[in-house]
Amino acid sequence: MPHPRTLAALFVSLVVLASRAVGADGLLSAVDAYVAEMRGRTLEAASARGAALPADFVAWIDSDPLLAKSVYGCRKDPLPVLLALRSLEIDLGEDAVRRTHTQLAIAIAMQDSYAARGAQGTGWNDADGAKTPAALPDVSPRTPLSLVIPGDPRVPVDTKDPSRTLDVHDHIVNFLEDHAEIDAEIAVKELPPLEYDEKGVAKPQGKAVTVMKTVRRRPLGADVIASAALQAEFNAFMAANGHPEVRIDCGDRAVHWYSTEAISDKDLRARIKTAHDLFHDAYRAKGRMPAERDRAPTMAESMAWFVRNDRHAFDDATRAARQWPRFPLDAPWPVLMMLAADDQPLREREDIWTKFRDAGEFRTYGEYIGDIAQQFDMQSARRVAPIAFSYGSIQMMWKDGGVCGTMGNIGARTHRIVGQPASTAGQPGHCAIVFMERDAKTGEFRCKGGQYATGGDEVTTVHAGWNYDDRGGRRPMVFHQTVAWGVNAGFEPFVDTLVMLRVYDALPPEERARRATSLVDEGLARNPFAIALVEAALAAAPDPAAAIAVLDAFEARVEASDAARGRELYRTTVRDLAHARVLALPAPADATGAAALLAELERQSCANARLLARCWRGIGGESEFNARTLDAARRYLSSPERAKSKRDREAFAAMARAWADSVKGKAAKAAWASAMLEPFAGHETIEVRGKKPAQDPAVEALRKLAGTPAAPAHG
């Protein structure tokens, strides 16, 4: 990466450039000048590092203004993007990078400028948590990449080799593989038997159901852990073969193949873990399991693999049956970023891809196994057995099962394997998935959630990085939705707003503060989903009035846009961001200022409990706060939405908890909560048609704060 002094000098020059280019015509007019300047500086930086870039490669980028903006205008330092694009071209060839899969190449180059790839991959194989790359992409001359899918890395060891002394792992494997067959219960899917009507005609057959069957097979490590009798045999066998110190005691069916209960006995859990480690280590040492997980692919290998699959020649019938392509890989690069982030090892991908390609298998949900999944060691012990893949792989998730995190991983990874951008996502106490999709009729893109459990888009945070603002990191679902909506509203205008952000960031702080409102007005006129510009403007707002003005500018542009007007979550998210900025700024100095600010906040339907509380206290101290919160409780009780909307009930409960947090002292907090409960007397429960009466979550929260017991339900 460039030396810090070089970056500092570049920043100074960009400040001058941006200040001159913006002028009176606004930030959009500076986009082309900024891109041209960054092009020159980036090519100079490449040359200074000895990175040879062919003239025709540079000319190819220059020939397409949108491509040039994407390469030179979307990162503060475009050099990693430029070199990654060239590196991909060296490995994959001009046809893939310059013609058929340019957008995928840009997405990978952009993604890899944010998140470094490593041999081990990332925890959930979506680049979440990856560090910024320390090295630049390699553009040295080399032969084109030949895509090779690794084979099974296991090399079985002869555990009876007479030419050497057998070790403890040999004996463990020999016990298992030489043992007589045992009865084992397995779950299988079977179609129900055919039924016939009175005329002897077969009725439509039902769906396959899971049934348990007993089969004969040699024991696995998991079988020994599950059986006290097999444990006794194992201990005797190991002692007879010179290893009396190797003993296991896991109880009888404390953990078994279909266990769902967690192990609460700490000593028992430790003994089961020891047994698991014995079998697992023996399987790995003797080639029954891989010694380690396969390495993650390079960016070129990853792209080559996706391109190869995209070019697969399905016949028309199979293409229709597979709904192929699941997502167009020539889609604009911003909507491909979650796919570009995938770093699953190729062999793991290939196994799932082959089943999809040949048999149409597309499974996005595995076996849900209950509380034992919260104990990874016990989850692993219940099914430890030979397998061609390691822990962390989707194949191991299929074998072992899990809870929501495993299900989300299976879903997101499977979507990406078939070429569809996807990621896991967090909800309160739950893991879900999100994915990009394209409407076949309208051609529009959307970011959609799946496996939701504890709320909708409004409580969902995507794990894949939101890599559009030069910072990256996790963002709420709506941020990723704005990418799809923004591309629908105009791919080039969307990229223009990303370049505008770079121009804006290069301005001096005082100039950014002065232009905060105009940035939003001008940016959203170009593309109404430029949330990155809104964030930047709010961060630069020097006082509450400026933040209020930024939100007003946003609302005016969104209201004028047919595409954006109905996006309520987008609008409330920006509203909440604006009011969070107001809260972070100094409060008004007197009651008059607090009242004026409160009027503006109420006009903007402020839902920030802490900010409202600060304003109320600024107007009239604690008595004003108490009166205002009681008024809010009465309005909530009289609202018809209270009975209709669980979301509204939970929102008010959250506000009540936030207000309580602002009350100092345990006794004062309890007194405030008791007063807040008074309007709820006789109305503590919610009656929803078709359901049992349930306690209002606000009442539950206030009772805990007040230290009062639950009262009998009233009508």
Describe each model-derived feature in a short phrase.
Residues 67-70, 77-397:
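Secondary-structure boundary elements
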Residues 368, 383, 398-399, 441-442, ...:
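His-Asp-centered catalytic microenvironments across diverse enzyme cores
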Residues 8-17:
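Bacterial N-terminal signal peptides
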Residues 23-66, 70:
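Intrinsically disordered, low-structural-confidence terminal and linker regions
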Residues 516, 520-524, 530-714:
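Extended amphipathic alpha-helical coiled-coil/heptad-repeat regions
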